[in-house]
Each structure stands twice: as C-alpha cells, then as structure tokens.
C-alpha cells in the first residue's frame, strides 16, 4: 500500500522499510502520553500484521480508521495484536484468539539502574554476536524448538523486523562464559524490549534486570524516552522483570488474533 493512501486515513503517518516489508505507524492526536498508536507491517503477497496500542476509550478513534485501511488493501492473511476490547465483530470481522499477552510501558527516568550482580562480569555490544545470542536463547528457553528457530528469532531482530537494533543491545560474560543477553529495537522513536534472556545457571540473580536497565540507559540520555514491552501472559519471570524495571502495565489484556472477514466465512 502506498504511503499516500494510508496517510489519507492516518494523519502524520510514518513509514519505514524493514526485512519483511514496509511498516506504517501513527499515533492518536492528543493522546501521545498514553502511547495510543497503530502499526501495520506489509509483509508482501497480501500478508499483513497489525499492532494496536490503545485503551477502551480510544477504540472509537481507531475503529473507523482500521476499517478504512482494511477496505483499501487486498489481503489474504491478517494477524493483529490488539486490546481484548477491540470490537472486531462490530466491524464485520471475526477474531480467532491465538494467544494472550500483557503490555508494559514507561519512561527512562522511571527505570532504576541496579548494581551489576557480579563485579567481574563484562558487558559487550551485540554487534557481531548474533550466533552467541542465539545459543543463549536456546539455552535459556525450554520452549524454543531448536537451533534454527533460535537463529531465526535473533536474526529477525538484527535485521530490523521490529525496528533498528539499538546500541544498548548486548550480552554479559562471566568467567569466560556468556550468561545472558538483551536486545532492544527502535519502534518509531520508542525503545522496544525485543528480547531478554539468561541461561538457567544465571537466573534469579538479577542479571536480566541489570541487562535491561543497563541497555536502556545506554540507548538514550533523555529521561522522557518512551519504553515499551510485550510478553506472553504465562511468562511469570518476564512479568516480575517488568515490575522490577518499574514499568507500568497496560490495564487491558492483549489478544493476538487471526482476522477473517465475516462475509468470507462459509
């Protein structure tokens, strides 16, 4: 879809090109401080993903605009990450819920900087460390299907699927062993906590919190820098980490959905 087409619907729309296709982003005028925003990724061949940050009182603003966008594009596959209250049925669509997530946000000035858990540890930039981070991800996440899946997940972040990789991204090494990593992406001016992980032997020692806080403070010196994060609703460890980082939880549960137009259902 052309930027001129979507900007007719979404004032001040921004566009970026990424590995999987163009990204379009807009905020609700006057509601910047609530991060009420919409992002769409055109993945090519009629495949789109939508990501809506909104609260119930903003749904009305986005309903008409999302409906207009979906009427303008030709799509064969549409996935959306939206607040649970978003009224797909009212717009003539069915939403099949695939997963539940929580969202968090805050400003850099709210994130405390803890002491490094071990003074002999060394932080290093993520630059050139994709394979090392993939190994860390595989070791840290028992649900990861395997090496290729870990490489793909890390590679997507490096190649900008979620936005440009930021300089605060890095990993930590202790006694010659890499024990954890944190990857941060630029999402149209906000810092997105794209991935944080530590190996089992380093868990519950404060490393994830330190890596995230250290990385965030390396990204920017602006105390009002926005930070965003999203996590699976069943991920208790990440939930506790968000609390430790002093980020605010978006009150509403988030749905990851597959969207189908009602008229196309048999």
Please state what every model-predicted region is:
Residues 88-93, 241-243, 247:
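Conserved active-site tyrosine of GNAT-family acetyltransferases
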Residues 36, 97-99, 179-180, 208, ...:
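A structural microfeature
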Residues 53-119, 253-259:
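Acyl-donor-binding surface of acyltransferase catalytic domains
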Residues 58-71, 198, 204-221, 239-244:
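Conserved acetyl-CoA-binding loop-helix of GNAT-fold acetyltransferases
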Residues 78-80, 193, 227-231:
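Conserved hydrophobic beta-strand within the GNAT/NAT acetyltransferase core sheet
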Residues 5-9, 115-191:
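Flexible, substrate/cofactor-facing loop regions flanked by secondary structure
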Residues 11-73, 174, 179-194, 199-200:
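Conserved donor-binding loop and adjoining core beta-sheet/short helix segment
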Residues 21, 75, 224-226:
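Short, high-confidence coil segments that cap the C-terminus of an alpha-helix
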């Amino acid at each position: 879809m052309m930027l001129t087409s979507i900007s007719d619907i979404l004032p001040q729309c921004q566009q970026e090109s990424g590995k999987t296709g163009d990204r379009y982003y807009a905020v609700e005028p006057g509601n910047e401080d609530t991060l009420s925003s919409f992002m769409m990724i055109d993945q090519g061949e009629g495949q789109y993903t939508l990501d809506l940050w909104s609260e119930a009182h903003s749904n009305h603003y986005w309903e008409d605009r999302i409906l207009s966008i979906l009427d303008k594009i030709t799509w064969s596959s549409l996935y959306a990450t939206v607040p649970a209250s978003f009224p797909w049925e009212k717009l003539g669509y069915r939403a099949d819920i695939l997963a539940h997530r929580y969202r968090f946000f805050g400003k850099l000035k709210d994130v405390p900087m803890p002491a490094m858990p071990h003074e002999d540890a060394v932080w290093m930039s993520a630059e050139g460390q994709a394979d090392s981070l993939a190994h860390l991800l595989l070791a840290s996440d028992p649900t990861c299907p395997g090496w290729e899946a870990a490489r793909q997940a890390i590679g997507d972040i490096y190649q900008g699927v979620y936005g440009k990789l930021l300089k605060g991204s890095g990993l930590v090494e202790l006694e010659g062993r890499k024990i954890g990593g944190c990857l941060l992406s630029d999402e149209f001016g906000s810092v997105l906590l794209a991935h944080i992980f530590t190996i089992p032997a380093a868990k519950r020692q404060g490393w994830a919190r330190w890596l995230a806080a250290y990385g965030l403070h390396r990204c920017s010196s602006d105390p009002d820098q926005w930070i965003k994060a999203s996590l699976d609703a069943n991920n208790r460890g990440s939930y506790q980490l968000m609390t430790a980082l002093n980020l605010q939880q978006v009150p509403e549960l988030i749905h990851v959905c597959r969207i189908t137009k009602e008229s196309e259902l048999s």
